[in-house]
Amino acid sequence: GKRPCRGISIVGAGGKTSTMFQLAKEYAGMGKRVIVTTSTHIFRPDGYEVVLKDQPEWLERLMEFTEKPGGNILVTAAEEMDWKKGKNDNFPCDKAKKKLKGMEPHEIGRLLNYCDVLLIEADGSKGLPVKVPAEHEPVIIPETQVVIGCAGLTAIGEMIQEVCFRSEFLERIRKDGKVTEQLL
């Protein structure tokens, strides 16, 4: 039978990935089977089991995960791709890394059958601490029960165009061009 599962989508900017993996550790510490995924892109995390949909053993590995006792974390995505820092990226690393590409929303919803808790990074912000979403964002699956919004407090007092993804929308609101607590 289907296990009860909490679908949690994490959106916004600064701190999404850290928040997602901290929650994963806490839920695993409570004996839950946790799947971590994305509907956009995330860097491939170190120290976690990763299974990709484009691997032939994908479904078999998901089934094995369901049979494990609680307290485990599995990271899954559609595929792995090379990533090099672009001119609009604000990630702290310059070297080439691997990124995981998210699955389609209907595919993510199916992961609920294999876990107790499903954590989804559902937004991208090019590594910046603040984001104004476009009309098609964030990519939240219908099965989401909780949405957590993140923003980096390091942006407070900084110039919007330096710390905000899609800053042009905020610059129209704030004439002095600075990020404030109220703005976040």
Model-derived regions: residue spans:
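Walker A (P-loop) phosphate-binding motif
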Residues: 1-28
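Solvent-exposed alpha-helices and their adjacent loops that cap or buttress functional pockets
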Residues: 1-3, 28, 64-68, 110-113, ...
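General beta-strand structural signal in soluble alpha/beta enzymes
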Residues: 10, 34-39, 74-77, 118-122, ...
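Short active-site-adjacent helix-start/loop capping segments
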Residues: 17-19, 43-47, 52, 81-85, ...
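Short alpha-helical segments and helix-capping/turn motifs at coil-helix boundaries
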Residues: 18-22, 59, 104-105, 133-135
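N-terminal phosphate/diphosphate-binding loop that engages ATP/GTP or pyrophosphate donors
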Residues: 24-78
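Ligand-binding beta-strand-loop-alpha-helix segment within the catalytic cores
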Residues: 63-102, 116
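Conserved catalytic-core segment of NTP-binding enzymes
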Residues: 84, 93-117, 122-184
